[in-house]
Amino acid sequence: EDCIAVGQLCVFWNIGRPCCSGLCVFACTVKLP
């Protein structure tokens, strides 16, 4: 599965996708309702 790179802008289609590292934007690691 694709992951979010550090510093990548978090947009709606990235919500809930895994991060490439622990330093990514928090919102990308959280599934919104």
Swiss-Prot record:
<keyword id="KW-0027">Amidation</keyword>
<dbReference type="GO" id="GO:0005576">
    <property type="term" value="C:extracellular region"/>
</dbReference>
<feature type="modified residue" description="Proline amide">
    <location>
        <position position="33"/>
    </location>
</feature>
<keyword id="KW-0872">Ion channel impairing toxin</keyword>
<keyword id="KW-1015">Disulfide bond</keyword>
<protein>
    <recommendedName>
        <fullName>Omega-conotoxin-like Vn2</fullName>
    </recommendedName>
</protein>
<dbReference type="GO" id="GO:0044231">
    <property type="term" value="C:host cell presynaptic membrane"/>
</dbReference>
<keyword id="KW-0108">Calcium channel impairing toxin</keyword>
<keyword id="KW-0638">Presynaptic neurotoxin</keyword>
<keyword id="KW-0800">Toxin</keyword>
<keyword id="KW-0528">Neurotoxin</keyword>
<feature type="disulfide bond">
    <location>
        <begin position="19"/>
        <end position="28"/>
    </location>
</feature>
<dbReference type="GO" id="GO:0005246">
    <property type="term" value="F:calcium channel regulator activity"/>
</dbReference>
<keyword id="KW-0964">Secreted</keyword>
<keyword id="KW-0960">Knottin</keyword>
<dbReference type="GO" id="GO:0090729">
    <property type="term" value="F:toxin activity"/>
</dbReference>
<comment type="function">
    <text>Omega-conotoxins act at presynaptic membranes, they bind and block voltage-gated calcium channels (Cav). Has strong insecticidal properties at a dose of only 100 pmol/g of body weight (when injected into the haemocoel of the wax moth G.mellonella larvae). Provoques tremor and uncontrolled movements in insect larvae, that are typical symptoms caused by neurotoxins. On fish G.niger, intraperitoneal injection of the toxin causes full extension of the fins, change in posture, breathing difficulties (at 30 and 100 pmol/g body weight) and death (at 100 pmol/g body weight).</text>
</comment>
<feature type="disulfide bond">
    <location>
        <begin position="3"/>
        <end position="20"/>
    </location>
</feature>
<feature type="disulfide bond">
    <location>
        <begin position="10"/>
        <end position="24"/>
    </location>
</feature>
<keyword id="KW-1218">Voltage-gated calcium channel impairing toxin</keyword>
